[in-house]
Amino acid sequence: MNQSIEHIISRPDTWRGTSSHQASHFILNTASANTTWPAARSISTGFASLDAKLQLGGWPLQGAVEVLSNDDNSECMSLFLPTMQTLSAEKRWQTFIGAPHTPYAPLIQAMGIPSEQILMVHPKTREELLWATEQAVRSTTCSVVFAWLGSAHYRYAELRKLQLAAADSDTLLIIFRSSDALSASTPVSLRVHIDAYREISVIKQRGGKSEVAIRLPDNPLFDSNLAAREKTKVTATRTGTYLIPVA
């Protein structure tokens, strides 16, 4: 196992979706970490209208995605539920670093995302947050890393380290930041701004058209296919959000 990610997992402020040693070993098996996306450069967002506007036809796998919004980004997480559902087939960690809230278990279960794949890390400082994010991305044990950088100021060089880590990995890296950073330059491969409910603006994308606005469907959780497959669970979580505050 990668020593850095092992250190992160062993921290007292890290939570795993299961305490089973067997399940953890299964997820951290690096032998098959690159088997699902060996040559892919992107993964579908799960929204045809958004994929059509992105240069690679989805979220870039070799580069960071920066998501800006006016709140703490918790409501933005529904945007990534379809991708998380797809990545769950890899049986690797889906890692949350510095998240202001915890995943709403009934909802992720309704989406078919195993809770034992969820790894939450709670850094105490910005330096720990940056370090944990880079190490998680560079390891081969995470299919996706969500990192909440918030409204703090980050140097271009600090963000570039994360971008380079993502460029050398098949791990999807999503960085959440405040809209206050909109005027700051960024080295990421894709930058989007969520300025209203389900309204996304593509601010920057390498090799593609920018300043593109997309209105997404109301909620991917309630499409006809999922409703038919998970009718009871969907009904029970219609009013829930993807994330709930940490107790």
PLM regions and their residue ranges:
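Detector for small/aliphatic-rich hydrophobic stretches
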Residues: 1-96, 208, 237-247
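Conserved inter-motif catalytic segment of the P-loop NTP-binding fold
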Residues: 38, 91-146
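Helical mechanochemical/support elements of P-loop NTPase systems and associated helical scaffolds
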Residues: 46, 76, 104, 129, ...
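Short acidic, S/G/P-rich loop/turn micro-motifs used as interaction or catalytic elements
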Residues: 71-74, 125-126, 150-155
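A short acidic, amphipathic alpha-helical/loop segment
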Residues: 79-83, 107, 132, 158-162
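Hydrophobic/aromatic ligand-binding patch that stacks against planar heteroaromatic rings
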Residues: 86, 136, 165
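A contiguous pocket-lining binding segment that forms or flanks enzyme active sites
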Residues: 140-183
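Phosphate-binding/switch region of NTP-binding enzymes
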Residues: 175-245
